[in-house]
Amino acid sequence: GVQTNITVHVADYAQKYADDKILQYINENIAGKNLSDMELMKKIAAYPASFDYGASHSGYVSMIIYGNGDCWASTSTIIRTCELLGIDAWSRNGNKDYGAGSGHMNTMVYYDGKYYELEAGYSGTAPRYYSAEERDSLFCFHDKDDGTLSIYQYDGQLTSGDTLEIPATYQGKTVTEIEDQFSQGSNRTCGTIHLPDTITKIGAFAFSGFEQATSINIPASVKEIGTGAFAQCLSLENFECTGMGNNYASQNGILYSCDKKIAISGPAVNNPQFASGVQQIAEGAFSYNTNLVKIVIPESVTTIEDAAFFDCYSVKNVTIKGTDITFGSNVFYNCSELTLRGTVGSAVETYANENGIAFRDIQEPPKNGLYQEGDSWNYY
């Protein structure tokens, strides 16, 4: 008999239907129309605005099939239209913009050497309002009462080898602050973060989640760094504290106050080597550092603040050499396999007992409980 090989391509008909509708719109409204760049952007934004707003659908396929969708659906439709046109587009977090609702989303488009922000996610019935704006910066700013600017988001695309270069000025105004949760909605893929010497404040969780960043400079102008500013930066071991009179210092991958009395952040270290004479571990200093396995806290430390080791779930063994320690709340939250080693009768033992944490006398000889750390084996 004759053997015949048959290749069957299975397609999602709903997606094919939606794509055909977009292509029909392109053929009728864009192809061969000799549009300017801005006219093209507006035509792209107009298509999702031709459907009603509806909270039940959040993708382009469901918007086109059911005739309505939310801002996520409008964004999805714009991105798919751009893909079919061979234009680069990506979603943008819009919920920090003035007047925006929680979870709002719109679109960034790169075309012919320019960046555009497209919006078609407004509520109402069709035809809904839409807009296209050429962007002169990929950063987003808020005006401050003192006439300077804070920066709240980056809307561009980065790769692991790129530098995120924070601008010193925008439209003649000085940039002085990185807002809380700058990282939320920002592209977090970069190798280096560079701050200008105009920055005075880095907000809470500002760079949280920049997991591939290995280095950031802290200029002498910085006077305040918020809690968790570098949380979940699991590769960030290089803090470059530059300039005379800097308020901060670094050593062995840990950021300190200038006198090294306060450990402020150690987002990537796995076995922290604390500076001599350190007295305080700041709030959230090592929070979300899943690299941590073993910690020895020197006798000089008298205060461990709230959530200092919050969600460091990989840590197994913490030795606290001091006896008169003040603990904040949730210091070792979600460190479920943790054993604390300290002096019997000390504040360390009391804290362990009150918080359901295993305790072992610091003077107790090693027992037959082995754990592997890198290429070596250690006793509990």
Q: Which role fits each region the language model picked out?
A:
Residues 1-5:
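Intrinsically disordered, low-complexity N-terminal segments that are enriched in acidic
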Residues 13-64:
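Secondary-structure boundary elements
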Residues 27, 31, 46-53, 83-87, ...:
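Sec-exported extracytoplasmic/periplasmic mature domains
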Residues 47-105, 110:
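Active-site neighborhood of thiol-dependent amide/isopeptide-bond enzymes
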Residues 95, 99-112, 118, 122-123, ...:
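Extracellular adhesion/carbohydrate-binding repeat motifs centered on closely spaced tryptophans
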Residues 139-147, 159-176, 188-201, 210-224, ...:
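Structural signature of tandem-repeat unit edges
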Residues 155, 184-187, 208-209, 232, ...:
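Glycine/tyrosine- and acidic-biased, solvent-exposed loop/turn segments at the edges of beta-strands
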Residues 181, 203-206, 227-229, 282-285, ...:
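Consensus positions within tandem repeat domains that build extended binding/scaffold surfaces
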